[in-house]
Amino acid sequence: MDTRPIGFLDSGVGGLTVVCELIRQLPHEKIVYIGDSARAPYGPRPKKQIKEYTWELVNFLLTQNVKMIVFACNTATAVAWEEVKAALDIPVLGVVLPGASAAIKSTTKGQVGVIGTPMTVASDIYRKKIQLLAPSIQVRSLACPKFVPIVESNEMCSSIAKKIVYDSLAPLVGKIDTLVLGCTHYPLLRPIIQNVMGPSVKLIDSGAECVRDISVLLNYFDINGNYHQKAVEHRFFTTANPEIFQEIASIWLKQKINVEHVTL
């Protein structure tokens, strides 16, 4: 038994979609979450800067005595995950491979779409992972840079959000049967995305998919939390306004949480 928390990092609030699924599947595990909303989005930034920011988040989580770090951010996974994983002596998990694997299982026509930040799409990481495992699958990637600002400003239900999603996804409509939400912010726009793509298109939440891998690693390294502990204390940190973060988090997690401000 290991009661240390699991650390989550993201460029902002998007990683809460992963946390929500972890709380549902593994309610006995403690969580420490750091969202760098003050510098979001990461997607348009240079690789060097993304790597620097990611390491700052990682080092913060290490001060919290975490037993595992989850990159709840596709952009950080694409740019820095391999380097961080090689440098640390605790498990470090990204969200890309679980999402890619789920897309392979989902598609029936071999036509998969991937939406993400400009950096995630430019890295071509999803296509590489998918076609490494299933070379016959055709992957269409599309950058959606306007999605993260919508979520970070808590405008997910606005009319402008609907227009932006509709306009952004137009190149993929009718061309795929599976769509990977290759940014953990995007599930917060899921109802609009599903409406635009149509009911026949399966949406893959890369963050939610990675929770299964978290469970596997906890078992493999024998670092599961206390199964008998009914109430666990989670800690949430943001580099931006805690009130905005708290508002979005409370809606998504369906519970009131305390959010602390941190300067990196």
From Swiss-Prot:
NCBIfam families: glut_race, PRK00865.1-3. The keyword Isomerase applies. The keyword Lyase does not apply. Pfam families: Asp_Glu_race. PANTHER family: GLUTAMATE RACEMASE. One of its GO terms (biological process) is regulation of cell shape. Homodimer. Pathway: Cell wall biogenesis; peptidoglycan biosynthesis. Belongs to the aspartate/glutamate racemases family. InterPro entries: Asp/Glu/hydantoin_racemase, Asp/Glu_race, Asp/Glu_racemase_AS_2, Glu_race. It catalyses: L-glutamate = D-glutamate. The active site is at 73 (proton donor/acceptor), 183 (proton donor/acceptor). This is Glutamate racemase. One of its GO terms (molecular function) is glutamate racemase activity.
